[in-house]
Design a protein with these regions (language model features):
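Conserved phosphotransfer cores of two-component systems
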Residues: 49-52, 74-81
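Two-component/phosphorelay signaling modules centered on CheY-like receiver
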Residues: 12-36
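Hydrophobic/aromatic residues positioned on beta-strands within the core alpha/beta folds
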Residues: 87-88
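Acidic catalytic/metal-coordinating carboxylates
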Residues: 40, 67-71
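Alpha4 helix (beta4-alpha4-beta5 surface) of REC/receiver domains from two-component response regulators
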Residues: 70, 77, 91-95
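Acidic, metal-coordinating helix/loop segments flanking the phosphotransfer/catalytic sites
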Residues: 37-56
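Active-site residues of response regulator receiver
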Residues: 9, 59-60
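Receiver (REC) domain active-site loop signature in two-component systems and cognate sites
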Residues: 63
Length: 95
């Protein structure tokens, strides 16, 4: 089974690190995955179409413009099946 994974983070190094961890996780489990990076929620929405559904999304909580939480709310109205994980480098937001 292959997974399509989207990572939305405005900090490029964070996004690349998440991609590396995600791909290592998939390799260890002998799963195929295709990972795509997006620098903003708006960039994700622009690139996302009905035929390009993601299985898993990793969304940065704090981004300029639309936040990861706002993006998740928008996506949930359209697709209740996608798995969403929130990520942050702000310790006060981690729980």
């Amino acid at each position: 089974m292959g997974y399509r994974i989207g990572i939305c983070d405005d900090e490029r190094s964070q996004a690349q690190g998440l991609r590396d961890m995600t791909e290592a996780w998939a390799r260890e489990r002998r799963l195929s995955c295709r990972t795509e990076l997006f620098p903003s929620a708006e960039a994700f929405l622009f690139a996302c179409t009905e035929d390009s559904a993601f299985d898993i999304l990793l969304l940065d909580v704090e981004m300029p413009g639309m936040t990861g939480i706002d993006l998740a709310k928008t996506l949930r109205r359209e697709n209740s099946r996608v798995q969403i994980l929130f990520v942050t480098s702000h310790f006060e937001l981690a729980g």
